[in-house]
Every structure is written in structure tokens, then in C-alpha cells.
């Protein structure tokens, strides 16, 4: 005779594996916009590995390229959050 016991605890899946993604963001407003962009990255991504910003005098759009660790499920939300910022012209995977 065998006796099997099953746990009644609900199944919880393991956290999603984080992946490294490179994101290119183009924005207007110059250097004053960088803190808001970085805040958005850190709120939706887990860790910023690389960050490069190119702001030039007399040029309308500036660019920021970042490499972040993010779960695959949160990637679209991160890109959408960047695009919702009023200073952002575009945000795409690089």
C-alpha cells in the first residue's frame, strides 16, 4: 500500500530570467531630460549595465543608448514607459 501526500499550497512559478537588452532612445530637451529617462529605466529594468548619452549643442534630438537587465515580460512595458515621456521621440531595441 502506498500513501501519497500533496501540498495544498498554490503553485508559484519561478521568477522570469533576466535578459540583457540594448535600448536606443532619441529625445528632445537636452541634458535636463536625462534624469527622467534614467529613472524610467531603473523603475522598469532591474539594472543598467551601460549608459551612453549624446547631447550636442545646436542639434534638436539627443540620443541615449543603454543596456539593461530586464525580464522578457517587462520589456514592452519598459519601452512603452519611455515612449510615454513627453521628451522622447522614439525608443526601440538597438
Kindly give the residue locations of the regions a language model identified:
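Long, contiguous binding/interaction regions
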Residues: 1-61, 69-94
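Short acidic/polar micro-motifs at solvent-exposed secondary-structure junctions
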Residues: 66
